[in-house]
């Protein structure tokens, strides 16, 4: 009577569960309708989001968030996580990267310093604060064309002013837990890595070049 090795049995078990899990996922996807976005990365592509955005933020104003907006919002929130307990801090992002970042004694100064880093790239960018946005700061923000403004809270008058731009997306961020692992599709499979939770401190920096 033929027998199979432990290695072979593990292989067949893996294949069997792979098939059954795809069936279960197909049922889940049918009932868990995805949010259709305006378009994907480019206007000729379709795009969807599968998840619960309401756990992350409340949208207070503006048009529907786009595929690219969501990528930038994710990058902004992940960046600011390291500075939740810091002095007033402001960041400006474009294409998933920070083009301006600053911490100061008050939020207006933090915003202006972040903007000064690269005012050209800031145009049409994503703005995020680690504290409530006040009227003074909102008045400065309102002179810049930006896609999204994110903060844990907004002063009432500041919010009214920021809403004066019809399409500007205003998001009130919630205190949300994010998984320690990040997944992304790759070669018909999934890559998984631990989230980068290490914060570099300026005192550990070493000067390698002198101009």
Map each language-model feature to its residues:
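ATP-dependent carboxylate/acyl-activation modules
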Residues: 19-211
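Internal, active-site/partner-interface "lid" segment
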Residues: 1-30
């Amino acid at each position: 009577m033929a027998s199979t090795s432990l290695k072979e049995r593990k292989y067949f078990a893996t294949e069997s569960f792979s098939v059954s899990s795809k069936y279960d996922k197909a049922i889940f996807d049918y009932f868990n309708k995805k949010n259709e976005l305006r378009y994907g990365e480019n206007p000729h592509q379709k795009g969807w989001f599968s998840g619960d955005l309401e756990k992350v933020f409340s949208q207070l104003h503006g048009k529907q968030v786009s595929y690219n907006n969501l990528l930038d919002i994710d990058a902004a929130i992940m960046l600011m996580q390291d500075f939740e307990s810091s002095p007033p801090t402001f960041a400006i992002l474009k294409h998933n990267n920070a083009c301006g970042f600053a911490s100061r004694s008050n939020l207006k100064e933090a915003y202006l310093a972040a903007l000064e880093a690269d005012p050209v790239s800031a145009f049409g960018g994503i703005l995020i604060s680690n504290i409530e946005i006040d009227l003074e700061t909102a008045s400065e923000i309102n002179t810049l064309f930006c896609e999204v403004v994110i903060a844990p809270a907004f002063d009432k008058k500041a919010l009214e002013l920021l809403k004066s731009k019809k399409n500007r997306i205003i998001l009130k961020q919630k205190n949300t837990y994010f998984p320690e692992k990040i997944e992304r599709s790759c070669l018909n499979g999934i890559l998984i890595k631990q989230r980068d939770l290490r914060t570099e401190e300026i005192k550990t920096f070493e000067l390698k070049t002198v101009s």
